[in-house]
């Protein structure tokens, strides 16, 4: 039963993290193309989505570790599994970085650094590609 619950939470977290990340990226790109700064209430929603996504990524890590131990007896699966872990690590690091940056910007009432946000998004996309490719190679 614990395996089922962990798989369920793992997949739900995947959808939540992905939805938050894509939603934020789409809305921010529209504002950027129009040369506008988001209103304060919308900027707050960016922070909330980023935080929810971070929590979802952390849940994926915890449930993934539990699943690897329960199903496979540990992390010694294959090189492709470690590529997946590298991708997941990049996603976790960028999510933490973005959340810390948005929190500081909110406290100081300044707009987010667009260069940092751009490179963080690119790093997260790379992590996503590695995580998906590694998961497909390992588990399919």
Set out the residue ranges of the language-model regions.
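Polytopic transmembrane helical bundles with strong interfacial aromatic enrichment
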Residues: 1-140
């Amino acid at each position: 039963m614990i395996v089922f619950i962990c798989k369920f939470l793992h997949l739900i977290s995947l959808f939540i993290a992905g939805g938050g990340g894509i939603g934020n990226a789409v809305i921010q790109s529209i504002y950027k193309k129009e040369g506008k700064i988001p209103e304060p209430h919308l900027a707050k929603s960016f922070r909330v989505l980023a935080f929810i996504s971070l929590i979802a990524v952390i849940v994926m890590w915890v449930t993934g570790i539990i699943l690897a131990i329960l199903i496979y007896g540990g992390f010694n699966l294959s090189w492709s599994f470690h590529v997946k872990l590298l991708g997941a690590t990049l996603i976790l690091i960028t999510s933490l970085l973005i959340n810390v940056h948005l929190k500081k910007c909110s406290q100081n009432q300044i707009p987010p650094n667009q260069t940092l946000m751009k490179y963080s998004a690119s790093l997260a996309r790379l992590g996503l590609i590695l995580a998906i490719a590694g998961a497909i190679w390992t588990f399919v």
